[in-house]
Amino acid sequence: MIREERLLKVIVAPHISEKSTIAAEENNTIVFKVAKDSTKAEVKAAVEKLFEVEVTGVRTLNVKGKTKRTGARFGRRNDWKKAYVTLKEGSELDFVGGAE
């Protein structure tokens, strides 16, 4: 069993993009930014506990930070981890709250 304190630190934020919106509409899949050291089991447990939905699958990937330039200096954004969480048929998460 994963401690509740850890579950609250696993999910960082929902990741909103054109690709994630299409995935949500067509495949009932929600995309989250998650902690870099989190596992698929932790992500599944966190989503089920926090949002009270049933998860059928979790796919994770590491996103490399982009190199950015400010004047003559180059810097690099941080690497981060993304999780595609597939929900059971009939389950739904709404982050926008019906705003249209």
Swiss-Prot record:
This is Large ribosomal subunit protein uL23. Part of the 50S ribosomal subunit. Contacts protein L29, and trigger factor when it is bound to the ribosome. Gene3D superfamilies: 3.30.70.330. GO terms for cellular component: ribonucleoprotein complex; ribosome. It comes from Pseudoalteromonas translucida (strain TAC 125). Keywords: Ribonucleoprotein, Ribosomal protein, RNA-binding, rRNA-binding. GO terms for molecular function: rRNA binding; structural constituent of ribosome. Belongs to the universal ribosomal protein uL23 family.
